[in-house]
Amino acid sequence: VKLRQRFPAGADIEADALLAEISAEPEGGPLKVGDERIISFLTSFARKLLAPAVARRFPELASLGFFLRKAEIAKALARLSDGDASTLRFARGLVFHIPPANVDTIFVYSWALSALAGNRNVVRISPRSAGAAEAVVDALNEALADAHPAVVQTQRMVTYDRNDAVTATFSAAADLRVIWGGDRSVNEVRKLPLAPHARDLTFPDRASFAVISVDGWEAASAEARKEAAVGFYNDSYWFDQAACSSPRVLFWVGDAEKAEAGRDEFRRLLGEVLVARGEVIDPAMAVQKRVSTYGAAADGVATSIRFDGNALATLELAEPTTLVREWLGTGTFPQVTLDRLADLVPAIERKDQTLSVFGFSRDELIGLVNTLAGRGIDRVVPFGSALTFSAIWDGFDLLHEFTRLTTVSV
């Protein structure tokens, strides 16, 4: 089976031939953790993503460009230093990445951190990935113009239709396999064996939520409330609310009557953002939303439903502990009011990832996380930052995962 070489762009190639090329020693010697050859390539790639024309068309790529700036890279690498002379850190070797098709820029984060850790990488880009992924591949290939030859010799991105034989070939050669996707696809890939020393790093289905403090909302300025609506819009609508960190349920915490007033205002402000951004939901999605929301009501999960045009639907949840974790369609928000933040705890499960918050103090949130004690929720972020990728993701410190330690205790 011939694979389409996306980066570096080249003739179609078979998996075995690609592995033979990538396992040769690169010019200038093997890559090291924090290798200058990779850093200089990543910063040049970041500049291409931050170019106004690209950032305007795909705003999500601007945050990727920001993540890969030299200062950010230095910060990430600084967290790696163990300050222990007897512990040396090295790359794992060959890392095989299988990213999801629905959030088509996530592969760049996991690839970039793995390359920064000094690994050779093979990334499968889904044939279904769309505009933003194409823009990323173009920017990567443009950045090659001034790159060290070691980049081409150690980093590959390919596209092929689902093919277990090809995936098995890459899996058998890998020292680490990184799988993003739904639970089913993670389990399918896991059936393909790895070398005995190798392991998987999995990012399966996750659910995320948003929480607003009723008192915090009341105390906030009109400007801060508007900004909260814009942040919530970015968190929810950028990837059609399908990203693992986009909120699926909105909680209000505090007095129920005041919460009603807050909800009305929030819905109005969000509606204004939707109009300002020209958010258009296609007819198929509008139908999907109605089917899934009426389905939730029929199942007794929701007690009432409200549509504000096709772009915004809100549902009242019957039980604060029975949460809707599946995707109901772009711009569909089940809501529930809780008396206290601690009432959220019984509802949280291991698969719950991001909590986007507005109007709480840091101490309140640390108290919540301590009460959760690891049963779920890997990150707590302000509105507008749900989709901001970080080198610690799903509870993993990725640079640590992408490296291995050798100790010299003599």
Where are these regions (language model features)?
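N-terminal Rossmann-like NAD(P)+-binding subdomain of aldehyde/semialdehyde dehydrogenases
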Residues: 1-92
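Donor nucleotide-activated moiety binding/catalytic core segment of transferases
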Residues: 79-96, 102, 160-168, 313-330
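Conserved small-residue-rich beta-alpha loop and adjacent elements
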Residues: 80-144
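Short, well-ordered alpha-helix to beta-strand connector turns
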Residues: 92, 173-174, 247, 351-352, ...
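Short hydrophobic alpha-helical runs that function as membrane-insertion/retention elements
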Residues: 121-125, 178, 356
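Conserved NAD(P)+-binding/catalytic subdomain of aldehyde/semialdehyde dehydrogenases
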Residues: 149-256, 392-410
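NAD(P)-dependent aldehyde/semialdehyde dehydrogenase
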Residues: 239-356, 366-367, 372-373, 381-400, ...
